[in-house]
Curated annotation (Swiss-Prot):
Entry EC no(s): 2.1.1.228
Name of the molecule in the record: tRNA (guanine-N(1)-)-methyltransferase
Gene expressing this chain: trmD
Biological source species: Colwellia psychrerythraea (strain 34H / ATCC BAA-681)
GO BP: any one term: tRNA N1-guanine methylation
Ranges in a coiled coil: none
Superkingdom in the source lineage: Bacteria
Source taxonomy: Bacteria, Pseudomonadati, Pseudomonadota, Gammaproteobacteria, Alteromonadales
Length: 253
């Protein structure tokens, strides 16, 4: 996968280029990652990248010319590498990201993410140069860098070969629309600060893979129903899941 990012703070992306799953994917050549700074496309000695909005009001907007030139450079680089890129603007008014959206984005071979700053960008630029707007949630951030890293990390996990275990992405929370089941590691008995002992569920120690599968499915359904019940509204559960959920609802009141 080819990924480009346009940002006034490209250094922030060291968090994903140098560390973790995404860093390893870049080093292994599974993700081809590039950065563009609109400041590099300015024509004044101050490298100005902001401008006042028409109509007045607080705050500034990202200047059109440097940003538009950066987008053009990113698009051209993507085409040189084999095809047209989809340009994504991280924006509060965009489609809210969920796992379905991540899966859709992962179907594209080339993506360019624009990390906005200040009060945003000119609406005409959104109409003419942006393909899609995406939001990571209904809250305020100082810029689009963190949302861009959020999306890139989520998408990267679906790139073939990025995760060490082929089933890891399939078993993550939301991959099947449900929250993930609880997980446990050593020690088998954990002592709390209050002196209580908490043990690993016996089924996980049984070695019976079918019992473990059913337990994990039940726990996933239970956790989703008690913590995020709205997620169940749009899911097409299997007959086995429907039966398990019905039993859970009878047992937990």
């Amino acid at each position: 996968m080819w990924i480009g990012v346009i940002s006034l703070f490209p250094e922030m992306f060291n968090a994903i280029t140098e560390y973790g799953v995404t860093g390893r994917a870049i080093r292994n050549g599974l993700i081809d990652f590039h950065l563009w700074n609109p400041r590099d496309f300015t024509h004044d000695k101050h490298r100005t990248v902001d401008d006042r909005p028409y109509g007045g009001g607080p705050g500034m907007l990202m200047m059109v010319q440097p940003l538009r030139d950066a987008i053009a450079a990113a698009r051209k680089a993507a085409e040189v590498n084999g095809g047209k890129a989809k340009v994504i603007y991280l924006s509060p008014q965009g489609r809210k990201l969920d796992q379905q959206g991540v899966s859709e984005l992962a179907q594209h071979d080339r993506l360019v993410f624009i990390a906005g700053r200040y009060e945003g960008i000119d609406e005409r630029l959104i109409a003419s140069d942006i393909d899609e707007e995406w939001s990571v949630g209904d809250y305020i951030l100082s810029g689009g860098e963190l949302p861009a890293m959020n999306v890139i990390d989520a998408v990267a996990r679906l790139v073939p070969g990025v995760l060490g275990h082929k089933e890891s992405a399939e078993q993550d929370s939301f991959s099947n629309g449900l929250l993930d089941c609880p997980h446990y590691t050593r020690p088998e008995v954990l002592t709390t600060p209050q002196g209580d002992e908490m043990s690993v569920p016996k089924v996980l120690l049984s070695g019976n893979h079918e019992h473990i599968r059913l337990w994990r499915q039940e726990q996933s359904l239970l956790r989703t129903w008690t913590r995020r019940p709205e997620l169940l509204n749009n899911l097409a559960l299997t007959a086995e899941q429907e039966k398990a959920l019905t039993l859970i609802k009878k047992q937990v009141k």
